[in-house]
Amino acid sequence: MTRAIVIGGGIAGLSSAALLARDGYDVTLLEKNASVGGRAGSWEKDGFRFDTGPSWYLMPEVFDHFFRLMGTTAAEHYQLLRLDPGYRVFFEEDVRAGTPPLDIRDSREANLDLFEQREPGSREKMSAYLDSAKDTYEMAKLRFLYTSFAKFGPLLRADVLKRLPKLLSLLRVSLADFAARYVSSPTLQQVLGYPAVFLGSSPYITPSMYHLMSYLDLEDGVLYPVGGFHKVIRGIEKVAEAAGVTIIRNARVTSIDTDGPGSGAHVTGVTYTGPRGGKPKTLLADVVVSSADLHHSETALLPPAQQTYSQKWWDTRVAGPSAVLVYLGVRGRMTQLDHHNLFFTSDWNDNFGRIFNEPRSIPDPASIYVCRPNTTDPFVAPGSDTNLFVLIPVPADPSIGAGGLDGQGSPQVEAAANAAIAQIARWAKVPDLAERIVVRRTIGPADFAGDLNTWLGTALGPSHILKQSAFFRAGNKSKKVKGLYYSGGSSIPGIGLPMCLISSEILIKRLRGDGSTEPLPEPLFPTVDRTV
């Protein structure tokens, strides 16, 4: 059989390995850590169970499609609940005025009503905004997300050409400016601009093409996998193993091996060691797929002559934010919070400027995200206690430091965590929050860099600014080494769990020479064994 090695056991690596095995390859996956999942991990302490990363389940059809490609369904592996409210928003100016937070509902009509209440006369314009968001989203799925851009002919379709003037306009205007055309309320503009953070970016530098994200949270709805996101990871791991994938954990890849030193060589396999070094081991392969951070894959695992994306190239790129993550076990209930909660400061220019512009620093006060999953799932915290996951966007800079248990992380990380805890206590009216904390763990940019090998300690990957979107984003095939491919958030189509699943499908299409733009037919039928 044709042998394939996948580097990295995050969602992109697991799904890539699964689809490769389904396609007929003999697949081995190497994961540097003791467990798979990457950013989408799980941590437990004293009866509290935390998702360590992703917590928003959007684009459910992408997950369903992946599982159907594998001959099963998402529903066979985990249960989904629809959230209503989808999320709650605390605005700084509302806190000052004593106004209740805004609950974003699970339907278009309910959210149009909310916008109309906040800004009388906005309903008609917001209806047009959501119509445009949905149309752009459907066009993206059909023509731009499931393609490797290896061939541009399939993109020259009548439906694309018809929308070309609109698409070009959406690329030239920022998301912030585009949203301001539809609503004048600064708080509503924040609701429309915040999805840029999911893209590792700022609404001031993100193309308005991405207003399509508002279709997902304001109309399509927000879901939750019961038990947490590790259930999703476990489901993908199970279908991968059922397809024949061999998973080797605690395997730190030290090099991608080739049959020659220069450009044009072919992969022969990889070399790896255990977590504490030891004697290197070599695995042979006809195809190598790295789902690890692309900067690490290129600059650490390949010599300069074989790097498609050299350090010089990376020096011209923009990293998405890093984050300080805070996992809190809190005694008692916190009904002031919903499942998903956003805390928006009034001065977003300052917030995003501190993250992306020099001199960079941790915003204070910061716009933060807080997840309280036991609003929906009683099994993530003991009894009537509360599980909180807090995300504070910070610059992609490992020098900010690492996290730790019980306040023992780096000073900047713990200071950001303390500020966020105080902010939640004040804005959500939980004055004794700090005294009720019984479990505390933090993660900082240095942890992302060290544990996940991420470029500059980014929590997400390269930002989705224009020059790093669609066909401008790093591709999924090496230009210097034959048989070397990529998947994951660093390459096309981009950041987020759904995009990582799509990247694994684009990989299969690239290997097959399939330049189409549509998702593959379900289920996936094998085309290998063959010469690559």
PLM regions with names:
Residues 54, 489-511:
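A conserved FAD-binding loop/helix module that cradles the flavin
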Residues 258, 512-532:
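Active-site-proximal substrate-binding core of FAD-dependent oxidoreductases
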Residues 252-382, 525-528:
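Mid-domain catalytic core of redox enzymes
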Residues 331-446:
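C-terminal segments that line or cap access tunnels to active or ligand-binding sites in enzymes
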Residues 185, 189-199, 363-369, 430-493:
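A glycine-rich dinucleotide-binding beta-alpha-beta segment and adjacent secondary-structure elements
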Residues 94-205:
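Rossmann-like flavin
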Residues 2-141:
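N-terminal glycine-rich phosphate/pyrophosphate-binding loop and immediately adjacent elements
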Residues 212-279:
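Helical element adjacent to the flavin cofactor pocket in flavoenzyme catalytic cores
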